């Protein structure tokens, strides 16, 4: 493999691993904050216990997110020196501000973990709130660099030189707010569904322990409710993202929908696989006129097809499958939430059948898969550009050798880290079962 493929594989693996912990690092604090708020309002000890236990998991995940994020930053400089030269001169603000966001998160996380029992109820909520603010701000700031890659602003390249630099224009690039909303909303969704998966699993294991079962049922319903809300909000934001693609990255939208010919009243292709030879999406379900309407809220909107662009600037055509998988996961998770809430609140069922709990157990893995598909779609769909229509990925890759060795090394490191996280979480929660916390709360 050439250096470009190896460099993209290495950095893609790093980001694919890091994004799991970064996403949960934003999503779990919201769950902790909501549990704290419910506890302070109702004085139901179950919610205080939820907040306490989820905080332990958050601490472990944060401990992995920090080094993997550092590795990702280092690899940016090592693998993409030409890209970082532009970022250093034009888009350094997010990295600088993110340092403060990280310190806010780390400071208040330490306060909440080590001094929660000595804080007043109001200060407990304040501490968790700033953990959430710091985590969300970090995610938004770093993801803003990705937004800048797709909708660059605040500089020009003339005769190979960077001129007319405006850091704030680069920071508030056209897709900043939409991208920021998408990353935060999807992180909240994922954090909730991970909790739902664990709660569903524990409900299956504790069917004969009524007190523990009720505790996990509350956690499940809370998680499904929050997950459902943010799944819906993520979907609405995704619609805005598609309209942004229509305006700023039309070939990416065409690739996502498998549209080859420019046309009005363009259909929306659901499912299927893009065939580059026949220039169509095979075995797809087409909804007439829907793509034109989704692109600009008019059925007669003209949507550019791939053939309107040079073939060497087409994104990989498999992004149609990634896009459909991402959307499909989101719709499935909304359905999960509706079923769970209806079963408990409308049908008034005290017990969930095992088959339904098994389905709910898949919510967390599906949400993470959706995050991964979305991230790969966002980055791969921008190719061959690293900065859209200004700088190609192949022009900024390092010429240093040994990338293959680094790829194998870091893959091994991530496997070890992943196994260590699973081991530590299982070890801690087996040593500290819910029964102990419930007994302490009742004594």
UniProtKB/Swiss-Prot annotation:
Keyword Iron assigned to the entry: answer is yes
A Pfam family of the record is: Cyt_bd_oxida_I
Give yes or no: UniProt keyword Transcription regulation: no
- Biological processes per GO annotation: aerobic electron transport chain; sporulation resulting in formation of a cellular spore
The region annotated as signal peptide is none
The family database entries (InterPro entries) matched by this protein are listed as:
Cyt-d_ubiquinol_oxidase_su_1
Task: Give the record's membrane topology.
Answer: Multi-pass membrane protein
Q: What does the record say about the knockout?
A: Not essential.
Principal place where this protein is found? membrane
Give the enzyme's EC designation: 1.10.3.-
Entry keyword set: Cell membrane, Electron transport, Heme, Iron, Membrane, Metal-binding, Oxidoreductase, Sporulation, Transmembrane, Transmembrane helix, Transport
> What is its subcellular localisation?
Cell membrane
Q: What's the top EC group for this one?
A: oxidoreductase
Please provide, in alphabetical order, the Gene Ontology terms of the cellular component aspect for this entry: cytochrome complex; plasma membrane
- Annotated membrane-spanning segments are 19-39, 60-80, 93-113, 125-145, 176-196, 219-239, 322-342, 357-377, 405-425
Q: Which domain of life is it from?
A: Bacteria
Task: Cite the cofactor comment.
Answer: Binds 1 protoheme IX group (heme b).
Question: Which residues are involved in binding heme b?
Answer: 182
Q: What does this protein do?
A: May have a role in sporulation. Can compensate for the loss of cytochrome aa3.
Family to which this protein belongs: Belongs to the cytochrome ubiquinol oxidase subunit 1 family.
This protein's name: Putative cytochrome bd menaquinol oxidase subunit I
